């Protein structure tokens, strides 16, 4: 019900709400609505992207996630802001880095070609200080390995090392998945 197309303009007005929680919810909703109705949220994309630089980590997290969902549906809508998203790969907040990976996975699902020269960014996240980020980082290699195995092949040695030696079981499992995807 909340994702209905006719609710998009109202949800867009909530981007400038009085509270962080309401603004965060509006960002999340616009991302979900944008996955289903990308053209209808297009007018809000510059406002969403402006939150990538917000001082509040929750709003950066939700903004990058929303751009990822919208970009999965129609990359051209978020293209002007795509490179801006990469600054969040080094964000001080782990949830922001995690959502950067998720957003990238969403976009790469339908538009993988754009990631070729950015793989080192994701390789750095394989050794992130936060376990949740490290657990998710191999997944972008899996997503891209299915679509563009040549992008992932230079990182197979590192992924193999993680799959055999990382302390975190999920990192090991996800690394194996990335390797299999690139070798299929």
Feature locations, PLM:
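Alpha-solenoid helical repeat scaffolds
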Residues: 35-36, 72-76, 109-113, 146-150, ...
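Structural signature of alpha-helical solenoid repeat scaffolds
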Residues: 31-32, 68, 105-106, 142-143, ...
